[in-house]
Each structure stands twice: as C-alpha cells, then as structure tokens.
A protein has these predicted regions:
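Substrate-binding surface in catalytic domains of secreted glycosidases
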Residues: 29, 55, 59-67, 147-259
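Conserved, mostly hydrophobic/aromatic
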Residues: 50, 134, 187, 226, ...
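Glycan-binding loop/region signatures in secreted carbohydrate-active enzymes
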Residues: 89-103, 230-300
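Active-site groove signature of glycoside hydrolases
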Residues: 115-147, 187-193
Length: 328
C-alpha cells in the first residue's frame, strides 16, 4: 500500500537519498534501438525489466510489430515486455497517434475484447517475450470506454496467466483510477509531462505533481508502479504559457547538455523538482530548456519509494546517463 505523510514539513529542496528498495525497468524504443541497447548493456545490473516499444496497428487494425525490434533479447535473465500502443497507420504511411476510436471498437463487446486479447497474446508468444504492457492513451475521459477497458484488463489478465505471461497496464495522469480494474496486473502511472510541448517552460514533474499522483494511485488494486521520464523539453520564444511561442520539442539529456555547452549556459537546479534548467539566445530568439539528470531521477524515485512505491519505470533508454541511479 502507499503511505502518504502529512503534517508540517519544511520544504527542503527535493533531493535523492536512501529509500526503501525499488525495482527498475525501462523501455527500448524502435527508433533508437542501437543507442538504447548500448545504454542497457552498460547498466545491465540496474534493470529488473525491459519493455520493447512498441507494437501498434496497421491500416486494417491488425497488430504490427516493428522490424527494428525483431530479435532483440537483452543479455541476462531480465524479463522482457512487449508494449502495445494505440497508434494506427493510415493509407499512405501516416500514423494516427493515440487513436481512441480504434480502442473503442476493439473493446466494444465481450466478443471483440476476447479477440483483441487473443491477438495480443498470440503476438507476445510469437515474439517470445515474458510479459505484455498495454499503453492505450487518450481514452480516460470516456466513461463507457473505461468500463470496457476494465473488463478488458480482467480478460487479458486471465488469458495471460494461462499463457504464463505477466501483464502491466500503463495509465496516464488524467486517467480515473477509482474504477473496477482487474487486481492481477501491475499498474504503471505516468508521472511526467507536467510541462512539455503543450505548455510553457517547466519540469516534467515536481514534488506537488508526484505527491498528487501518489494520492490518486491509492484507489488502484494490486501492484502499483511509478513511471518517470528522462530528458526534457526546449521552448522557443515562450510567452503566455507557451501559447504564442515558437517551436517546442522534447529533447534527451545528452542533447540538453550539448545545448548548454554550445551556448555557454550554466544549468541551475530547481528546488521543487530537482530538474535542471537554463536559457540562451540565438538568432534573435530566446530559448528555455528544462531537463532531468540522474540526480533528478534519484530525487523522484526517493519521493515515490518513501511513500510506498516499490516499482519504478524510466522512460527511456537512449541519450541519458543511467549510471548512479539508486535502487535503495
């Protein structure tokens, strides 16, 4: 269970430290496989699980596994999960990301849910993974769909157990968590993108946001995990919460470090998030960068672990220095 402390508290800067032990997992993504696997192999002893990101759907609505993830098997005995996302190809090669309508169709009836579960398990067995991770996003505000999704999690858990597969369900921060989810899977709550390309400058997570999510997670059944994001975001000419600004894009830690060095900027650490930030000017534009490093990750992990979380996932392997992460 989760233990949420309260009462008078001196708001010290958020920082890492010793904490109850946690397991750590991460994702290797299809578009950055080589760098992701290189980083995994450098830090293999850290990891208790690796997810292959991701299977999606072709234009006919059938599951599609990316070629870049074929024959990927991390060394060691670490469990490997197959992540399934609700992105769908369109004729002509374009993709619809986070396709709510497709999920609604797949989960509409008991029969359609059963067929979808069987398709996922068939792919997982074909790719010889140890578990399934479902990451269906932008569905949380549709109550009827979420009821069907809860039915789907129960059916998936039962069928996966019979197939000797583990199940993890990824939930967005805005997803309702006091719904009748199955007790079997592990529920991984995304604790990131507090600030990002949808907003003005700021950290991907901070103390208040993480504590708010921990309280919300109390309603979830079974095992609970927190997911944090490495890297950061760059904002150009940001005004009025970014609404009138220029380009905004997510960047890796290594890209942020390179920008700071190129523009002779000295990053400062924000006490409420433990994230680093700096600004610079180029070609008449001003730029703001916020990003996390291992000190940031350790601070977030420490906060979650001290509140009862025993499993943490980090998005993602590729462009980040994972050395020095603390599991206890």
């Amino acid at each position: 269970c989760l233990f949420l402390t309260s009462g008078c508290r001196a708001e010290k800067p958020l920082a890492g430290g010793s904490h109850p032990p946690v397991t750590l997992s991460s994702w290797v993504v299809s578009w950055d496989r080589e760098r992701g696997m290189e980083e995994y192999e450098k830090t293999a002893d850290l990891w208790d699980g690796i997810s292959l990101f991701a299977a999606d759907f072709d234009e006919k609505g059938n599951l599609h596994f990316p070629e870049n993830l074929e024959n990927l098997r991390p060394k060691g005995n670490v469990p490997v999960y197959l992540t399934v996302v609700n992105d769908r190809a369109l004729p002509g090669g374009k993709m619809v990301e986070k396709d709510r309508e497709m999920v609604a169709e797949k989960l509409k009836t008991e029969e359609s849910r059963y067929h979808h579960v069987k398709d996922i398990i068939r792919l997982a067995k074909e790719k010889q993974v140890d578990g399934i991770e479902v990451d269906y996003e932008k569905i949380g505000q549709d109550r009827e769909l979420m009821n069907h999704f809860c039915d789907f999690t129960r059916m998936l858990d039962l069928e996966a157990r019979a197939a000797h597969l583990k199940v993890r369900i990824i939930l967005e921060p805005s997803t309702p968590m006091s719904l009748p989810y199955s007790e079997g899977p592990e529920y991984v709550v995304m604790m990131y993108n507090l600030y990002g390309t949808h907003s003005g400058p700021g950290p991907k997570a901070d103390r208040d946001f993480i504590e708010k999510m921990l309280k919300k997670m109390v309603h979830l059944p079974g095992k609970k995990a927190a997911a944090f994001s490495t890297g950061g975001c760059l904002w150009q000419d940001s005004h009025l919460l970014g609404l009138l600004g220029g380009k905004k894009k997510y960047i890796t830690e290594s890209e942020a470090i390179r920008l700071a060095e190129t523009h002779h900027a000295v990053p400062e650490r924000d006490p409420e998030s433990a994230a680093l930030h700096f600004s610079y000017k180029e070609n008449g534009s001003s730029f703001d960068v916020w990003y996390g490093d291992r000190e940031t990750m350790n601070a977030w992990i420490t906060l979650a672990a001290n509140e009862g979380i025993s499993s943490v996932s980090l998005w993602r392997l590729g462009g980040v220095d994972m050395n020095g992460l603390r599991k206890d």
